[in-house]
Amino acid sequence: LKDIMGRLGFTVAHGPEIEDERHNFEALNIPKAHPARDPLENFYLATAQKLQGNSAGPMLLRSQTSTVQIRVMENQPPPVRIISLGRVYRPDDADDTHFPMFHQIEGLLIDKHVTMADLKSVLRLFAMSYFGGDVHIRFRPSFFPFTEPSVEVDMQWHDRWIEMGGAGMVDPNVLRAVGYDPDE
């Protein structure tokens, strides 16, 4: 995975698994009233908040690897071309497709003149390199607070489609939250 994305010009970035609300939600354009912030949908950590000091806000186990993207953008001017791989945590009931801890991979490409066509091309190239040249993927319109436009990416497996994940162009509000100019 790292080799494939490395050939496409991406480097690997890492971030903490214990996060604050700014990196896990606010900078990702997820408002306070959004269902993704519900305490029943996250693992909030009272002990971590105490260790950070009384002025610290709530701390939680990260619910997505998008937090790494925020940290990279806060510390690096464009262009940015990274992937982040890591554990994420959500209080899901364990079954065949869910578990309270699972792994995510994300990519981030920030540069001038990058389009949705570029995103789709990178995802197709990755899928062909990882799963084989005859892989079929499709893109369905979707919504994520941190991307606009947003898509779900599916891969054909035998006679059915399997969701690979979500994707999209970084929302201008996310770019502003890290000090980037969305008009550039």
Residue ranges and their predicted role:
Residues 1-184:
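TRNA-recognition modules of translation machinery and tRNA-sensing kinases, especially anticodon-binding
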